[in-house]
UniProtKB/Swiss-Prot annotation:
Belongs to the arthropod phospholipase D family. Class II subfamily. It comes from Loxosceles gaucho. One of its GO terms (cellular component) is extracellular region. Dermonecrotic toxins cleave the phosphodiester linkage between the phosphate and headgroup of certain phospholipids (sphingolipid and lysolipid substrates), forming an alcohol (often choline) and a cyclic phosphate. This toxin acts on sphingomyelin (SM). It may also act on ceramide phosphoethanolamine (CPE), lysophosphatidylcholine (LPC) and lysophosphatidylethanolamine (LPE), but not on lysophosphatidylserine (LPS), and lysophosphatidylglycerol (LPG). It acts by transphosphatidylation, releasing exclusively cyclic phosphate products as second products. Its EC number is 4.6.1.-. It is an enzyme of class 4 (lyase). The keyword Metal-binding applies. It catalyses: an N-(acyl)-sphingosylphosphocholine = an N-(acyl)-sphingosyl-1,3-cyclic phosphate + choline; an N-(acyl)-sphingosylphosphoethanolamine = an N-(acyl)-sphingosyl-1,3-cyclic phosphate + ethanolamine; a 1-acyl-sn-glycero-3-phosphocholine = a 1-acyl-sn-glycero-2,3-cyclic phosphate + choline; a 1-acyl-sn-glycero-3-phosphoethanolamine = a 1-acyl-sn-glycero-2,3-cyclic phosphate + ethanolamine. This is Dermonecrotic toxin LgSicTox-beta-LOXN8. GO terms for molecular function: lyase activity; metal ion binding; toxin activity. It is found in: Secreted. Its main location: secreted. The keyword Secreted applies.
Amino acid sequence: ADSRKPIWI
């Protein structure tokens, strides 16, 4: 949901 960081983090 947080587009500022990669989904795997």
